[in-house]
């Protein structure tokens, strides 16, 4: 039985070393991205979205009439949409591992995926710009 304990410990140390190397080096980018795919990414109809389907969803809107349900309210900016969108793009460009995956210019809705630094776990962000 003691022999099994040493063997198991050795296997776990090797597995931990492999995962650590993959997580801390660019070598792990592709395998972790493949393991942690976000699934089907689609546009959201904020007026119809339900919080019941996804417990890890957090919905923020400027007013209740734009969203079916919401967790918090956003600020309302006194700016034209093109200027606001340009500033948004500047801020998004500063975020590490952020990728635009869907864009609907007509609805002004954009879907981004940002991955965590170590395991490349995906977070999906959807933003839509509304005119006053």
Language-model features and meaning:
Residues 4-9, 19-132:
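Ser/Thr-rich, low-complexity intrinsically disordered terminal regions
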């Amino acid at each position: 039985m003691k022999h099994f304990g040493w063997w198991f410990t050795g296997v776990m140390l090797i597995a931990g070393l492999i995962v650590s190397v993959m997580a801390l080096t660019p070598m792990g980018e592709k395998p972790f991205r493949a393991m942690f795919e976000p699934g089907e990414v689609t546009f959201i109809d904020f007026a119809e979205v339900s919080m019941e389907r996804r417990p890890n969803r957090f919905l923020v809107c400027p007013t209740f009439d734009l969203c079916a349900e919401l967790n918090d309210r956003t600020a309302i900016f006194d700016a034209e949409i093109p200027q606001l969108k340009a500033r948004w793009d500047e801020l998004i460009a500063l975020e590490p591992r952020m990728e635009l995956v869907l864009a609907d210019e007509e609805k002004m809705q954009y879907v981004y995926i940002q991955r965590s630094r170590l395991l490349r776990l995906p977070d999906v962000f959807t933003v839509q710009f509304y005119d006053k």
